[in-house]
Every structure is written in C-alpha cells, then in structure tokens.
C-alpha cells in the first residue's frame, strides 16, 4: 500500500508527494481519511484522482468532493486502481454518486461486480452496424427525427424550453412500453430537478428499471467531469454482460464540457477558443466513443445539450454535434406559441430518416410535413405585411394545413399530467404516420385548428373538432 502526504491545496486541486518509486499512475484513485460524516451518517473519505505527474515524486490530483478542512501533511493512500463503481442488478432502482455510493438513503448496495470508470471503447470488430428505429411514442420525434437503436441523439435548446421534461417522458415511455433499462446521468444540473425526477419516477413506477447517477451543480468540477463516465459504466455492464438494449440519458452534456474547462484551468493548461480546455475534443471523444452498439447489445443515448446564449457555434455544442446521429432542436419561438414538445420540425434532423431504413411511406409523409411547414415559413413575411387576403387559394390552403400540422405536432405528456391536468398520450408509429397523412391529404380541412392542439391520435382530434363545432 503506497502512502503519500498532501503538500499543497489550491481549491479542488491537491498536490501529493509519494516515496520514490511509489508514484501512482494517472487516473488512479487516492483516498484521504477524514473525521467527517456525510448526510447519511457514513464516514466520509475524500477521493482524489491523479491528473498530472509534476516530478520529484509529486502528483497533482483533482478532488471528487469538497476539500474543506483538508490540511497539508494529511496522509493519502493510493488504491492502485481508477475509481470503481458497483454495477449490475443490485443498482437498479438506486441513486448513486460519482463514486458509486448510494445517496437515496436506502442502505448499502450489495453488488458483486465493480467496474473502473475509465474503460476502453469497444473494438472496431465488436461494433454492430445494424440500423433500426426505436419507437418513442412522441409524434414529432418518431415522424421527423426518428431515433436509431444504439444511436446518439442530442437535444439542443436554451434555458427553459423543455429539455428535461422530454427526457423524463422518454424514460417513462421506454420503461413502460419496451420494459427497457435506462440510466440517467445528471451532470451538473439542478438538485431540485434531480429530486423531482426521482420522486416522479417512483410515483410512475418506472424506477425499478432505472439507475440514476447524480453530480449536481453544487459539486466540485472533478465530480461533474467524471459522473458521466460512472453512468456509462452502469450501461456498459448491461450491454456487455446481459446483452440488453440500454438507454442512457445525459442531462446535461454541456456541463461535462464546462467542468472540463474548470479542471483544465485549475491544472494550469493554456485555454483554447472561448476559454475552453485545449483537450475538449479528446475528452468528448473518449466519452462518446463508449456509447455504441456491439454484437451483444446496444446503448442508445439521449443527451440534453444546453446552448450558451442560443449560439450553436459555441465550441461545446459544436463539438457535440460531430458525434450525433440525430439532433432534436428545441425552439423558443415554438415554445412561445404554447406548442410542447417545442421541437423545431425544420431544424431537427436524423441520419436514419431514409426510405431504406424507415420505409417509403414514413419518409414521404415526413418530407411532406416538412415541405408544407417550410412553405408556411416562407409565406409568413407576406402575411405579416399584406395579410392573408393577398395569398393565392393554393397558398391559403397550405397555410391552413400548416397551422393544423403545427398544432398536431404538440402532445400531452404523462410526466406533465400533474401540471397540465391533461392525461399523457403514447402514439404508435403506425397511427402517427396515418394521422399526418390524413392532414396532408386534406381529409380534415373542415375541422378548426384548435381540434389538433394537445391530442394523441387523429381520432381524438376529429372528436375534439366535432365538439368545438357543436359548441359554436
């Protein structure tokens, strides 16, 4: 057992000197015993991760929790391995932190298997290239931005446009409809949201199929930088050992890049564009390349991406783009119209919206919807200046259908039922395509626009439309 001592503390960066010939490897976990106890009455040991070798047997480390009360000369023990976390069935339904410690107050996790958080990506020969759509039950996503099983989907949006609510609805739908296992990695987001998510998932009865890892906004950057890797370990176990199709939700991948920026600056590296770390692309690649399908199973990821100041060219979202198979762009303009989920049907793209993958019918309906909405967007300037009267009859029809389509893209969510009072809806892909096809064909031109707002299937819209017409 190698024992060193603390020689310098600068915030969350701690320098440790070891005896000659006993210097720990990069990424090794070091522990410091303290006399503190955590919120659950457990003895609190501080964990450090080796980040740099400074020479003279000194290593520079990054703390995974607060260094309050730490003093120079404190004894540091090298564990001889990276941070290891419990994986497998015992972790289902539990909430853990970056070190794999339970933080839900439900007692210890009795796991037999532990994985190191730093693991290589699957080899090229082990990766699967099969392309298949994953049904989510959300109309706008299934039709226009189909998710690929084992793919990576980014959810882009500024503050308050509904990223987290969509993520929660997806967890709910996947667990209930597919019985799939989900991992939720809360990376540097609000503690309140994490608490709400835990309580709502317990109420919805989907927690037993989910594992949660939290490293919230109040945690040190070292923790926020590594919590995504902890979540990945949990998913990798089920993919590799049980051959399962796992979903991992990362909220928010931007905070991962942000934590990397903080750690990089604290370690004294020269910043690159906009103050980001010079290793941004490398760190992002190491995380993203582990999220993939193998011949045994798949990991599909949905990543919420906060866009600073709504600027998609910022290095953090721009670097994330490179890894994604699909991008769901959430628009403030659509949210302002009261249309939720506020997915932009023209900006959002998916690699598998291809007739060879989704089929000719699905492809043509999706492109038809986009064509009508695009034409409506082009006509909006004319309408604003000259009014609807100046449009040709054909354009008037396009505008009427576009407004119906726009409203039909909205959908009541199960997880928002408590706030909206409207029961949530899951719409199958078949019903979804049929509904949009009927609107495009003009079968419902006689119904008022409001009939299409916040409904599930087209039958509901027709019923709602009849009631509105009768009432008027």
Swiss-Prot record:
ATP binds at residues 157-164. GO terms for molecular function: ATP binding; ATP hydrolysis activity; proton-transporting ATP synthase activity, rotational mechanism. The keyword Cell wall biogenesis/degradation does not apply. It comes from the Bacteria. It is a peripheral membrane protein. GO terms for cellular component: plasma membrane; proton-transporting ATP synthase complex. It catalyses: ATP + H2O + 4 H(+)(in) = ADP + phosphate + 5 H(+)(out). Its EC number is 7.1.2.2. It is found in: Cell membrane. Its main location: membrane. Keywords: ATP synthesis, ATP-binding, Cell membrane, CF(1), Hydrogen ion transport, Ion transport, Membrane, Nucleotide-binding, Translocase, Transport. Coiled coil: none annotated. Belongs to the ATPase alpha/beta chains family. F-type ATPases have 2 components, CF(1) - the catalytic core - and CF(0) - the membrane proton channel. CF(1) has five subunits: alpha(3), beta(3), gamma(1), delta(1), epsilon(1). CF(0) has three main subunits: a(1), b(2) and c(9-12). The alpha and beta chains form an alternating ring which encloses part of the gamma chain. CF(1) is attached to CF(0) by a central stalk formed by the gamma and epsilon chains, while a peripheral stalk is formed by the delta and b chains. Produces ATP from ADP in the presence of a proton gradient across the membrane. The catalytic sites are hosted primarily by the beta subunits. This is ATP synthase subunit beta. The gene is atpD.
